């Protein structure tokens, strides 16, 4: 559906959708005198916004202007360093009030996007700076700090424990911030395991390893909690240690975060788990030699993404929560003491502009620029996974050949899908003037970007929206296809059509991922694009052409290149991107996403991942073994989520090895970047 009202140009596509649909997807089922209805309950929740102010404006001026209107209920998060970014909680009025709010957004803000709702702050009238946590433990901070933003932190597992001089054990996990908004502390004899964060973020709970004596009263640390679940004869009861604290992600034998954390900071590095690399023979047994690198003894700060966020596999929620997670990790870094902070983020969307200008990408650029190791601040490095969408048919590319031109393709939605599905169409702003995007259902009902669709509607196309300083995008959505009492969208082949494409202009389209994240049971299914003309005329011959480990798809609108994780398309010295390769032959892992980024205004364009790391031992033995949620357990995680922590571990050492099989052709550089690195 075209937007139902004129929005400020800074409003992002998903904020617009939420307003147009009256925040339907954030609503709660309520009952009043037997009448059932859905409402966004502002007594329990606030909108959570990720804001970028204009270059000639300041966050402080925008904050002051919004706070002058009590009806907006604005609650700003801590300042994001000296950058142009801010996080903000507010009532719906703050983004719908035409008289006062909308003019302020137009005056001050360059971009604003919506994350999943959050509870109101406990202290709405006062804003705090980031709380300095660096000196609040029993031991002083070190020169190195590792941060992980993930799901599942097995802090009591043996690979993350160290032996004290007293003979006891202590976890190397300095702190965990669990972002689940309804998490409650466990109280034992008047002391709490898990503390709120009222002085800065004010949602979720944090769990510290230990506390300085002046701060320890009434608090139970991670080491204390481990001690409560340990006996000299039987060791640590990890099952009850996690279950009694409500760490639901650790109820499973496997967890995404447990694997990533072991690869990055475990005591047995990946090079000791795999057979010898050249000139050795990979078929020989691994050495199992304990690590002597800095990561094997480093302290870790872990941010646990909330269950609500992890259930939404699209990654639309990511920017605000990831930004605050990075701020939390940095709050443990001490000026002039902590020299390096390395943060691993293995999540990311398949959507976005893919030219380095997605809002979270530009925020990461600003943070690594500010935290560059000068002025007493640590050097910040962020390591990202390249993504796993190379073969998911989630990227369409079309270039106009005549004036004007048009293109159409199929968006295939499975039956019984339980979640809202999104796709995005992107073009350069200068080429978008005459573009019309149309979505047609399997039964023939059409929705257009220039026609307002009455509400409620099972599908729609948003009006053209400024996606960045250089781009225009159109949001395409289809509601769940599972049978329910409400409005049900058709499953099957929907058609997306783009008309008015200028000569030589490029159209890019991306499907938002919906298949569930690890251990998340949502009933969601993956949708994907199909080029019907290519399928009818060329797919048979293409299925007989197998080159460099891939079946040919030449001539198809579906492009495998240009599929990098939507957070991983900027070219920054402090932001690193890791793809995967197969140890057997050194080729890119079949699923590992490839570059290049779309062309944009940035001076440097990302061509591919920085490097590729071992992600599969062979084509039959996919994945890489690393730790599960209990001591001694291992499992194979398949995907570039296993590559990012390997590259991060090399970044910790600040000295990368010489890559093998360095690519020279543009196509191979887009796939494997600087070449194949041996595991750390």
What is the predicted role of each segment?
Residues 7-10, 153-262, 272-293, 445, ...:
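Active-site core segment of subtilase-fold serine proteases
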Residues 2-146, 151-172, 565, 573-574:
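Autoinhibitory propeptides
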Residues 642-657:
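Short, small-residue alpha-helix embedded
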Residues 147, 152-158, 173-177, 181, ...:
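Catalytic-core segments of hydrolase enzymes
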Residues 333-336, 340-349, 380, 392, ...:
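C-terminal subdomain of the subtilisin-like protease fold in secreted/lumenal serine endopeptidases
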Residues 170, 257, 319-322, 326, ...:
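Amphipathic alpha-helical segments in well-structured domains
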Residues 243-352, 437, 636:
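Subtilisin-like peptidase catalytic core
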Residues 203-244, 436, 440-446, 451, ...:
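Catalytic-core environment of secreted peptidases
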